[in-house]
């Protein structure tokens, strides 16, 4: 198990950060390695919502919302050869919203052989992605076209 932690202050209200970032379909707007994100379940985003994701370095991976506590906390999890749970916690601070992300990855079977390389890549990507997310939200672009239910 490896946990990668990142934190960033985003100059936007907590509800806006939560609503934009919890909806992983928005990740295509700020994460250059996301190719597609499709919602599989009906209704609004919440506990049990499922998505299918395609990143540049993976096949299609199914995600499930494992925690949902608006506007303070959520988690998305996937199984597979490298199981990942990303847990995000938000708190209000002077100047905006503090976002804390924990990327918890566990390798199974043959994936353990390349897991150290995966972790090195993800450490860099996750830190960089915090900056991309911040820029997207603070520019106001995020609010222009967020997908909802």
Segments (PLM) and residue ranges:
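A short, structured loop/turn motif at beta-sheet edges
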Residues: 14-15, 42, 66-71, 89-98
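Beta-strand/loop substructures that line and gate deep hydrophobic ligand-binding cavities in soluble
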Residues: 77-128, 132-135, 144-146
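Glycine-centered tight beta-turn/hairpin loop motif at sheet-sheet or coil-to-beta transitions
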Residues: 1, 56-58, 81-83
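Generic structural detector for well-ordered beta-strands
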Residues: 7-11, 38, 54, 64, ...
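Hydrophobic ligand-binding cavity/cleft-lining segments
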Residues: 1-42, 149
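Hydrophobic/aromatic beta-strand elements that line small-molecule binding cavities or substrate pockets
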Residues: 6-8, 61-67, 85-92, 103
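Short, highly charged C-terminal tails/helix-capping segments
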Residues: 34-39, 132-149
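Short, hydrophobic/aromatic-rich segments at coil-to-beta transitions
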Residues: 44-52, 68-76
């Amino acid at each position: 198990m490896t946990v990668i932690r990142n934190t960033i202050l985003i100059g936007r209200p907590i509800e806006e950060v939560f609503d934009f970032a919890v909806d992983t379909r928005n990740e295509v707007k700020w994460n250059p390695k996301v190719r597609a994100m499709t919602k599989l379940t009906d209704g609004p985003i919440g506990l049990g919502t499922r998505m299918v994701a395609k990143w540049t370095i993976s096949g299609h991976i199914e995600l499930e919302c494992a925690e949902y506590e608006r506007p303070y906390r959520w988690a998305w999890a996937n199984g597979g050869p490298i199981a990942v749970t990303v847990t995000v916690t938000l708190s209000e601070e002077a100047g905006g919203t503090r976002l804390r992300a924990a990327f918890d990855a566990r390798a199974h079977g043959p994936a353990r052989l390349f897991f150290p390389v995966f972790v090195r890549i993800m450490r860099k990507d996750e830190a960089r992605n915090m900056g991309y997310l911040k820029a997207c939200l603070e520019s106001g672009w995020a609010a222009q076209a967020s997908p909802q239910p």
